[in-house]
Amino acid sequence: MSGEPAPVSVVPPPGEVEAGSGVHIVVEYCKPCGFEATYLELASAVKEEYPGIEIESRLGGTGAFEIEINGQLVFSKLENGGFPYEKDLMEAIRRASNGEPVEKITNSRPPCVIL
């Protein structure tokens, strides 16, 4: 024994599916609006929770921050006026990864705070 810790595998054991695998997310956002940082923050949180997930970004129109899970629109900033709560998105991803129906997210946090 060398006293070195054994390497930790991030690959799931045979027969187990990596969390989020089979789920494809597309986030369409307005880059000139400054929404790229919000996308990157959200994508990082999602990948941490669901390492097997596929996340794709697309540039969208003015004011857009739209999220699709497996081709289904689950959140629209254009409709809701804010951004999704992380917990609501994680729940939608969990449902999709379990093969359950995904409902549209209607709760949203304000896009900015006025002090």
Curated annotation (Swiss-Prot):
S-geranylgeranyl cysteine lipid attachment residues: 112
Post-translational modification: Isoprenylation facilitates association with the plasma membrane and enhances the migratory phenotype of cells by inducing increased filopodia formation.
Membrane topology reported for the UniProt record: Lipid-anchor
Gene Ontology CC: cytoplasmic side of plasma membrane; cytosol
Annotated keywords: Acetylation, Apoptosis, Cell membrane, Cytoplasm, Disulfide bond, Lipoprotein, Membrane, Prenylation, Redox-active center
InterPro entries, per database record: Selenoprotein_Rdx-typ (IPR011893), SelW_related (IPR051441), Thioredoxin-like_sf (IPR036249)
Tissue distribution of the protein: Widely expressed with highest levels in kidney followed by brain and testis.
Disulfide links within the chain: 30-33
Entry's localization field: Cytoplasm, Cytosol; Cell membrane
Family: Belongs to the SelWTH family.
Assembly and interaction partners: Interacts with GPX1.
Protein role: Increases cell migration by inducing filopodia formation at the leading edge of migrating cells. Plays a role in regulation of apoptosis, possibly through control of CASP3. May be involved in a redox-related process.
Protein name: Migration and invasion enhancer 1
Gene (name only): Mien1
